[in-house]
């Protein structure tokens, strides 16, 4: 169906966003498109119900009643994920317990994905926390990849652990540093010709930070850090052997 030229021009002027099947031979220069205004996402409202549910699931977790904790925790996690950091510290315990308790493959997969998603959401709402910032949370995410996905997500785990070590420095969680070396070594064994330098770099940062922790007289975990440094040093020593002998 054809439109008269005057009608086409009128429609084009009134609704410039419409796409035309046949353009006029001498179209008017289009107006410069204005950038869409940036709309900041509103923080979820922390309702009285959320506050009550935080108290309920936290008390259940303290008593290791993880099944009872799940329902109030899930409600808070969905509706007011910015209410309290315990949503994530307690949530990790809840998800881990339920994951271990179920034999249903679909439920295990759901909980595994939830464990990772939870850390991303924690970064979104609490990534600027002075004690447990984004770098710390990335370490927790890397450990979650290992715990819930085993050797199927080693690259993702390593990336998170490496970023955590770089960001936290001497304040890094000991297990993050140890697992960084473990995971990097596992990846190296799969591709010894291409990932040797990556493994050495990961080992060096982990060993150096563990050494700082082990030699810090004010660190209550200095002895543990020293033992773990010996462990990662032993892993690094295998590079002097042929990969088939390891």
Model-derived features with residue positions:
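Bacterial Sec-dependent N-terminal signal peptides
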Residues: 1-32, 92
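Preference for long, solvent-exposed alpha-helical segments and helix-linker "stalks"
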Residues: 24-246
């Amino acid at each position: 169906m054809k439109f008269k030229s005057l009608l086409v021009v009128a429609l084009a002027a009134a609704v410039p966003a419409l796409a035309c099947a046949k353009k006029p031979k001498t179209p008017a220069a289009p107006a410069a498109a204005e950038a869409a205004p940036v709309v900041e996402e509103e923080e979820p409202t922390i309702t009285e119900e959320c506050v009550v549910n935080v108290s309920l699931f936290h008390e259940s977790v303290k008593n290791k009643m993880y099944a009872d904790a799940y329902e109030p925790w899930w409600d808070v996690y969905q509706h007011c994920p910015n209410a309290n950091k315990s949503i994530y510290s307690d949530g990790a315990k809840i998800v881990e317990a339920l994951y271990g308790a179920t034999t249903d493959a679909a439920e295990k997969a759901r909980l595994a994905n939830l464990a990772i998603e939870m850390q991303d959401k924690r970064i979104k709402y609490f990534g600027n926390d002075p004690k447990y910032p984004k770098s710390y949370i990335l370490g927790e995410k890397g450990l979650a990849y290992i715990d819930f996905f085993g050797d199927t997500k080693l690259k993702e785990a390593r990336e998170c652990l490496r970023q955590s070590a770089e960001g936290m420095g001497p304040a890094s969680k000991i297990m993050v540093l140890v697992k960084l070396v473990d995971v990097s070594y596992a990846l190296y064994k799969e591709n010894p010709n291409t990932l040797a330098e990556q493994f050495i770099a990961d080992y060096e940062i982990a060993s150096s930070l563990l050494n700082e922790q082990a030699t810090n007289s004010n660190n209550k975990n200095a002895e543990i850090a020293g033992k773990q440094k010996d462990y990662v040093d032993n892993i690094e020593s295998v590079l002097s052997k042929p990969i088939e002998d390891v």
